[in-house]
UniProtKB/Swiss-Prot annotation:
<dbReference type="InterPro" id="IPR002496">
    <property type="entry name" value="PRib_AMP_CycHydrolase_dom"/>
</dbReference>
<keyword id="KW-0368">Histidine biosynthesis</keyword>
<protein>
    <recommendedName>
        <fullName>Phosphoribosyl-AMP cyclohydrolase</fullName>
        <ecNumber>3.5.4.19</ecNumber>
    </recommendedName>
</protein>
<feature type="binding site">
    <location>
        <position position="96"/>
    </location>
    <ligand>
        <name>Mg(2+)</name>
    </ligand>
</feature>
<dbReference type="GO" id="GO:0004635">
    <property type="term" value="F:phosphoribosyl-AMP cyclohydrolase activity"/>
</dbReference>
<keyword id="KW-0378">Hydrolase</keyword>
<keyword id="KW-0460">Magnesium</keyword>
<feature type="binding site">
    <location>
        <position position="119"/>
    </location>
    <ligand>
        <name>Zn(2+)</name>
    </ligand>
</feature>
<dbReference type="GO" id="GO:0000105">
    <property type="term" value="P:L-histidine biosynthetic process"/>
</dbReference>
<comment type="pathway">
    <text>Amino-acid biosynthesis; L-histidine biosynthesis; L-histidine from 5-phospho-alpha-D-ribose 1-diphosphate: step 3/9.</text>
</comment>
<feature type="binding site">
    <location>
        <position position="95"/>
    </location>
    <ligand>
        <name>Zn(2+)</name>
    </ligand>
</feature>
<comment type="function">
    <text>Catalyzes the hydrolysis of the adenine ring of phosphoribosyl-AMP.</text>
</comment>
<feature type="binding site">
    <location>
        <position position="112"/>
    </location>
    <ligand>
        <name>Zn(2+)</name>
    </ligand>
</feature>
<keyword id="KW-0028">Amino-acid biosynthesis</keyword>
<comment type="similarity">
    <text>Belongs to the PRA-CH family.</text>
</comment>
<feature type="binding site">
    <location>
        <position position="98"/>
    </location>
    <ligand>
        <name>Mg(2+)</name>
    </ligand>
</feature>
<comment type="subunit">
    <text>Homodimer.</text>
</comment>
């Protein structure tokens, strides 16, 4: 079911959204919903991305994570280039169905295009002058992005 057909349906009572058993994702003005992917084993947040209706449907149907790239304006399967596929073990939707949480088995160990396990590899701290500084918390790369993506 596409995002257009989901959003074009008749109005739904808030109780149906918050307590019902029917998936009714609330896509934004661009037809996207925010997705948080976590490592099912460790609970680590791996990445935040977006799905359109087709990506959501493919993820549900295949059991592998599909996303919509806002920069490339196209659907993409996680790991289609790197081989680091996300096998979806569980999917959840938040209370008002405008965000999706997927628990995944991250094959190859890297979710980030930089080659790291997680896209959240820097912590925000305050420097001596109080200005924010980024502190690297994960320097280990599971792969060389230049070799994988040919940059």
């Amino acid at each position: 079911m596409s995002s257009e057909s989901r959003s074009a349906s008749s109005p739904v009572a808030p109780d149906d959204i918050e307590e019902g058993v029917v998936l009714r994702p609330k896509f934004d003005a661009h037809g996207l919903v925010t997705v948080v992917a976590t490592d099912a084993r460790t609970g680590d947040v791996l990445m935040v991305a977006f799905m359109n209706g087709e990506a959501l449907d493919r993820t549900i149907q295949t059991g592998e994570a599909w996303y919509y790239s806002r920069s490339r304006k196209r659907l993409w399967k996680k790991g289609e280039t790197s081989g680091h596929i996300q096998k979806v073990l569980e999917m959840r939707v938040d209370c008002d169905q405008d965000a999706v949480w997927i628990k995944v088995d991250q094959t190859g160990g890297a979710a980030c295009h930089t080659g790291r396990h997680s896209c959240f590899y820097r912590r925000i701290d305050r420097g001596g002058d109080g200005a924010p500084v980024l502190i690297e918390t994960d320097s280990e790369r599971k792969f060389d992005p230049d070799k994988v993506y040919g940059k």
